[in-house]
């Protein structure tokens, strides 16, 4: 049960007050980083008064706020955030000083933090889907001695499950850096992306690969505008074709000069027919090569369809001629493949060519 003082602080923090009350809020313990603390009663995010809406990139979940308070050795705020619902175990992950560890334990944190619980917290942080959550995860887990006992196989499995992207790295630190960077790129958390890239300039290739894999052309557009990319458009197309329905990324690579025939063939290799038909809709025409690849991949129905070359043609409505990311997303929002529809109609009308596995 919350004490009367803690409850009063929570009520005050959940309401906006004018700057006339700044001194009172400071004396009341609701002041942090040169500004008053505000707690959203609905989403439990903590943010400053400069934001009058939740879910900005500077918002902090209670756990992220707790870790930040532990780092700054702010005992009063540690107690306050735990009283408001933050899990005190999060304060123990970074192996804090003895007095901070003792406080977090007194507030309910269990020590020692077991390996299963450590990995469970890693997954919890990854699921926060916020800029602050990504930066929190990087801060908590990279260079963390608690992870030294975790096997590489276990860590690989956990990070792949959370990101759905194969990760590589010689060390656990490098693996986790790529992991949190990938999550920032997946959700286009620009503040986190810039934070990582400023510290890890050597990860440009990884940044491009992840952005294309996650269909994040906002980030690719920014890199192109700043002339940071020195990777061939066809190699970029390779990353874009790995994920299903990566239409915006495929289109952007095409606008940069990537071959649509290459994208079509890559999509067949990846058993990704929706991306393949998108490339055809954009203007891919090398159906002889596509038929050969489909046949070698035992995709006989697709191989037979490619024998009817006159079936396919470019979709003129996709002649977008735009490069602004938001406009590309908007134009493709209602996209459906005309060539896919023709192929389905042809198979329905000619059941004799269908090969049943």
Swiss-Prot record:
The keyword Plastid does not apply. Transmembrane segments: none annotated. InterPro entries: ASFV_MGF360 (IPR002595). The keyword Transcription regulation does not apply. Keywords: Host cytoplasm, Host-virus interaction, Inhibition of host innate immune response by virus, Inhibition of host IRF3 by virus, Inhibition of host RLR pathway by virus, Viral immunoevasion. Plays a role in virus cell tropism, and may be required for efficient virus replication in macrophages. Also inhibits the host cGAS/STING-mediated type I interferon production by inducing host IRF3 degradation through the proteasome pathway. Belongs to the asfivirus MGF 360 family. This is Protein MGF 360-14L. It comes from African swine fever virus (isolate Tick/South Africa/Pretoriuskop Pr4/1996). The lineage of its organism: Viruses, Varidnaviria, Bamfordvirae, Nucleocytoviricota, Pokkesviricetes.
């Amino acid at each position: 049960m919350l004490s009367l003082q803690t409850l009063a602080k929570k009520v005050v923090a959940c309401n906006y007050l004018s700057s006339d009350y700044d001194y009172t809020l400071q004396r009341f313990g609701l002041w942090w980083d040169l500004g008053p603390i505000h707690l959203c009663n609905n989403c439990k995010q903590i943010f400053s008064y400069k934001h009058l809406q939740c879910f900005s990139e500077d918002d902090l979940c209670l756990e992220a706020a707790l870790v930040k308070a532990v780092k700054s050795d702010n005992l009063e705020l540690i107690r306050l955030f735990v009283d408001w619902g933050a899990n005190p175990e999060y304060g123990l992950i970074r192996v804090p000083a003895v007095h901070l560890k003792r406080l977090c334990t007194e507030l309910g944190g269990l020590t020692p933090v077991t390996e299963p619980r450590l990995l469970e917290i890693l997954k919890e942080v990854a699921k926060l889907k916020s800029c602050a959550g990504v930066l929190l995860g990087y801060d908590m887990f990279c260079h963390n001695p608690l992870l030294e006992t975790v096997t590489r196989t276990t860590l690989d499995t956990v990070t792949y499950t959370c990101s759905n992207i194969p990760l590589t790295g010689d060390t656990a630190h490098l693996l986790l850096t790529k992991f949190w960077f990938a999550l920032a790129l997946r959700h286009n958390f620009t503040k986190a992306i810039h934070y990582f890239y400023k510290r890890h300039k050597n990860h440009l290739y990884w940044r491009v690969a992840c952005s294309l894999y996650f269909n994040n052309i906002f980030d690719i557009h920014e890199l192109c505008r700043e002339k940071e990319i020195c990777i061939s458009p066809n190699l970029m197309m390779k990353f874009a074709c790995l994920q299903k329905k990566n239409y915006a990324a495929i289109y952007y690579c095409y606008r940069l000069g990537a071959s649509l025939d290459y994208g079509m063939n890559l999509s067949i290799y990846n058993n990704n027919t929706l991306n393949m038909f998108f490339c055809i809709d954009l203007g891919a025409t090398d159906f002889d090569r596509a038929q050969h690849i489909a046949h070698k991949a035992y995709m006989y129905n697709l191989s037979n369809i490619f024998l009817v070359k006159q079936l396919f043609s470019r979709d003129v409505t996709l002649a977008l001629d735009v490069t602004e990311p938001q406009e590309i997303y908007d134009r493709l929002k209602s996209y459906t493949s005309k060539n896919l529809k023709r192929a389905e109609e042809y198979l329905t009308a000619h059941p004799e060519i269908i090969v049943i596995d």
